[in-house]
Structures are given as C-alpha cells and as structure tokens.
Amino acid sequence: MEDFAVSFWIYIGVMSIFVGGAVKKFLAFNIGAMPSVVVWLGATLLVERLCALCMPAVLARLVLCVCCWLYFTWATPKPSLPVEDKAVFITGCDSGFGNATAKKLDAMGFEVFATVLNLEGEGAKHLRKVCSSRLTLLQVDITQPQQVQQALLDTKAKLGIRDLWGLVNNAGWCVNIGDAELSLMSNYRGCMEVNFFGTVTVTRTFLPLLRQSKGRIVTISSPSGEHPFPCLASYGASKAALNLFINTLRHELDPWGVKVSTILPSAYKTGQSSNAEYWEKQYKSLLQGLSPNLLEEYGEEYLLETKELFQNYAKTANEDLSPVIDTIVEALLSPQPQVRYYAGPGLILMYFICSYLPLSISDRFLQKLFVQKKVMPRALIKQQGLSPNDNNNSIKENMNDSSSNNSNFTKCID
C-alpha cells in the first residue's frame, strides 16, 4: 500500500511538471515544440510506470527530482545576447511587420538597414521621422537581382569592417480573392516572384556576410504554407516553397554557425489588407482576367461573395503587431533561437487540430475558420436543380454573418 501511495504521488508530481510546461508554452502561443511536448508526455508516463513497477521509494523520489531539474533547465529562459555593435538587414519596411520591426530594433540600439519600395513613400518618411541616424533606408525591389546586389554593396560600404548580424526576410505579397481555378496566373507568378524567388535572392546574396558573422536568418512565413486554406492557393504555394527552402538552408548552414528561424504569424492587419479600394481593384482585375466560360460557370455573385468575405475577414484581423515583433527580436538575440516560432493567438488550437485530428475534422475546421462560403457556383446550381434566387439570399445572409463569425474565432493566417 505504501509503495502504491509513493507511486501515485510520483505520478502526480511528474504530471504536474508536464502540465505546467505545456501550459507555459500554450500561454506564450509557442507550439513550435509541439512534438517535444508529446515526447515529454510519453516520457512522463514511462517514468511513472517504471517508478511503480521497478523502483523503491527512495529511487523514485530521486527520479522525480531529476525530472524537476530537467524541466526547470528546459523552461528557464536564457539571457539574451547583447545588442551592441549588431547590424540587421530587413526587407519590406514600407509598412506592417517590416516597418514595426525596423522601429523596434532601432530603438533597442541595432544598426538597421531597412529596404522600401519607395524612398518617398509614407512608410519611409515615417521611419526617417521616428528613427535614429543608425537606420539606413535602401530602395530595393527584391524581385530585381540588380537592386539586391546594389543593396549588398551599400550595406558593406556602410558597415566597413563590422559584421552583419542578422537578416530578416519580411517582404511578401498576397493578391488572391478566389478559388485556385479562378486565380489569375499573374497572381501565382507574382506570389512566387516575391515570396519565394525574391527571398531566395536576398538570402543568397547576403549569406557570405552572415556566414562570416555566424549570425541569424529570420524569415516571416505563414501557416497557409502548411495548411490548405481555401482561396489562398497561390499565396500558400509560394509560402510552402519558401518553408522548404528555409528548412533546407537551416541544415546546410548549421556547420557554419548560422542560426535559421521561421516565424509563422496569425492574422494581422498589414499592408493593404484593410483597404476597401484595394479589394475592389483586385475584384475588378479578376473579372477582367477570367475567360467568359469560366465566369459563366462560377457566376459574378460567387466572386463578389469571396471578395466581401476577404474584406470582412481583414477588418477583424489583429492590429497589435507586437507578438510578431517580439518574436523577431527573440530569434535575433536568443543564444539558442527556436527553429520555428508561432506568433499570435489561435495558432495553438489550429495546429493541434490540423496535426493530430482526422482530415475530415481538420478540413472542415479550416473551411469554417477562414472563408465561410454560402454562394454556390452557377454550374453547380444547375446540376443540383436549385433556384438562382438561393444564391442572392445567401449573399445577403453571408454579408450579415461574416463579420460576427470572423470576430468570434481568432484568425490563423498572416
């Protein structure tokens, strides 16, 4: 009976350690170590059984103490590296994450090289106004290799004999308001040019400096590159390609001492996402680019609903960018940065469902989470013998419901 009591309390103690560690990670919205959490749980259960079956009480207590020590060693954050004499190159600083990161790093004392598409744009003017003289603005379109090469020369000239510590790949592009079949080929090519080829160009160009400093590469990607969000085929495909490139690079640069991290944010208001004129322009461009046959099969009302859903979804996205910015800082300054960071609310539930539950559940979850379409394509209505009036009613219902539905569930794409 005494052995049973000891085993029971050992079990309770070790399980408390596991639950505490898991809750700590969940509250931090960081499930990058989700597989390690599962391993930790399995090891906990195994230790409990071994304690119950094989070990005397004294040894069982010793095992519990070792588990406690391992947990606190694992859970206690290590001190950050010093900021002094560290320079960072950031792409896509006209707005959004890039603009906010440039301001944050400059305020911390970094020397910042911030790229913008337009040196006279509002984003560049704002950075000049609020940042110190340590910040250097560079006009760079990352899809133009000549401009990227010139940015390298300008950066090296400004640094002199000093090192470049970090590269933050932030520049990205998302133009898509339709199904994969409806998306224009220019959207697919545009997303790949910026999100994949542009980022590859910048990374390869600056790698010699980063290898020399044994520095950091931090890349902003998206959960849509790992999960099939409806209506994001072109954007998601480009981010999927980017994820594989960055992961491959991480293995190859490990012998050089370069740490590579990927950040996967939830939904935030960045760029043109909350601009009604922007969505209207994309909608008209889509109508003009579709073939008459395809437009007839889907119907203009189907496209209109998709546009309205995207627009309403963007309105409810998170305006506070600090979770992503703080994660970028951690990836740059942590002695042992994580391979993947999940920045923002809602990602815990989404990744758990998509990683551990059956596809039938995860697919339905993604459909309900993102764009909840009610309007059916015209061709499907004819096949099923429904009335076209049903679509008109669905549009009205969806427009009334979409805002409340989106705000009731935290969004999980950037």
UniProtKB/Swiss-Prot annotation:
Secretion signal, residue range per the UniProt entry: none
Tissue-level expression: Broadly expressed in peripheral (brain, gill, eye, heart, liver, head kidney, posterior kidney, and gut).
Membrane topology: Multi-pass membrane protein
One annotated Gene Ontology cellular component of this protein: intracellular membrane-bounded organelle
KW Cytoplasm (keyword) present: no
Pathway: Steroid metabolism
Chain segments annotated as transmembrane: 3-23, 26-46, 52-72, 341-361
Taxonomic superkingdom: Eukaryota
GO biological process: cortisol metabolic process; glucocorticoid metabolic process; multicellular organismal response to stress
Pfam families linked to this entry: adh_short
Regions of compositional bias (Polar residues) in chain numbering: 384-397
Alphabetically ordered keywords of this record: Lipid metabolism, Membrane, Oxidoreductase, Steroid metabolism, Transmembrane, Transmembrane helix
GO molecular function: 11-beta-hydroxysteroid dehydrogenase (NAD+) activity
InterPro entries reported for this sequence: NAD(P)-bd_dom_sf (IPR036291), Sc_DH/Rdtase_CS (IPR020904), SDR_fam (IPR002347)
Annotated localization: Membrane
Chemical reaction(s) catalysed: an 11beta-hydroxysteroid + NAD(+) = an 11-oxosteroid + NADH + H(+); cortisol + NAD(+) = cortisone + NADH + H(+); corticosterone + NAD(+) = 11-dehydrocorticosterone + NADH + H(+); 11beta,17beta-dihydroxyandrost-4-ene-3-one + NAD(+) = 17beta-hydroxyandrost-4-ene-3,11-dione + NADH + H(+)
Cystine residue pairs: none
Region of interest: Disordered: 382-414
Miscellaneous comment: As zebrafish lack the enzyme catalyzing the reverse reaction (HSD11B1), cortisone cannot be recycled, it is metabolized and excreted. To maintain glucocorticoid signaling a new cortisol molecule must be synthesized.
Family, similarity comment: Belongs to the short-chain dehydrogenases/reductases (SDR) family.
PANTHER family: 11-BETA-HYDROXYSTEROID DEHYDROGENASE TYPE 2, SHORT-CHAIN DEHYDROGENASE/REDUCTASE FAMILY 9C
Role played: Catalyzes the conversion of biologically active 11beta-hydroxyglucocorticoids (11beta-hydroxysteroid) such as cortisol, to inactive 11-ketoglucocorticoids (11-oxosteroid) such as cortisone, in the presence of NAD(+). Cortisol is the primary glucocorticoid in teleosts and is released to increase glucose bioavailability in order to meet the increased energy demands in response to stress. Functions as a dehydrogenase (oxidase), thereby decreasing the concentration of active glucocorticoids, regulating the hypothalamus-pituitary-interrenal (HPI) axis function in adult fish.
Protein name per Swiss-Prot or TrEMBL: 11-beta-hydroxysteroid dehydrogenase type 2
Organism: Danio rerio (Zebrafish)
